[in-house]
């Protein structure tokens, strides 16, 4: 999925 450094807010 998203990169490990991404915030949960960014994932959404």
UniProtKB/Swiss-Prot annotation:
Keywords: Copper, Oxygen transport, Secreted, Transport. Hemolymph. It comes from Necora puber. GO terms for cellular component: extracellular space. This is Hemocyanin subunit 1. It is found in: Secreted, Extracellular space. GO terms for molecular function: oxygen carrier activity. Disulfide bonds: none annotated.
């Amino acid at each position: 999925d998203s990169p490990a450094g991404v915030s949960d807010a960014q994932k959404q």
